Amino acid sequence: MTLRDKRQKEFAEVWLNSKWGILNLCPRFGKIRTTINILKKLKPVHVLIAYPDVKIKESWQDEFRECEYVDGFITYTTHLSLHKYQDYNYDLVVIDEIHLLSEAQIEACKTLLENNDKVLGLTGTLSKSTESTLLSELDLHVAATYTIEQAINEGVIVDYQITVIKVPLDNITVNDYKGKKRTEKKQFDKSIRKIRRKHYVP
């Protein structure tokens, strides 16, 4: 068992203590794997997973396949369609990327949460303002936080590396920039002059 696996199990246990709240776990840590640990313990029959876009749904399905976890009992929905499920009762409600809920979606969640007693919010980028809103509007507290600094220090994730690749601007091919014919380099030079004038840079 890797340290990442161990931490995922630990955070699953933290949430399972109350079966209510938000896990604020840094990007690339494994929020879905943490949730799978929760599902294995709860053994739910009906689960609702809400996500902001289809790419995230695909991530869930990919992880379930990789872990050989059957997801036939799971209802998937977008944040936008949460209102369609607000009157139903589930063994577990998972709201992924909970920090992205709009005001209207939070309103739909109020009814949903009144009808359900096991709610897991997932995020990796939770501002203090959003944390306060989710607590006051939905009574969802942060059950645990694992920052990117902690994950890097423990070697659970690798630090970001940024590589800058410099390429010369094309000064031969003429392009159309809002009706003006210029090369890429001349357009760039013009943009730089404009920025300097705006900010009084000599």
PLM-predicted stretches and their roles:
Residues 18-38:
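Walker A/P-loop
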Residues 46, 71-74, 89-92, 116-120:
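Loop/turn-to-beta-strand initiation segments
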Residues 32, 47-57, 189-202:
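Conserved strand-helix element at the start of the C-terminal RecA-like helicase core
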Residues 1-24:
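Conserved pre-motif I regulatory segment
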Residues 50-89:
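Inter-Walker segment of RecA-like/P-loop motor cores
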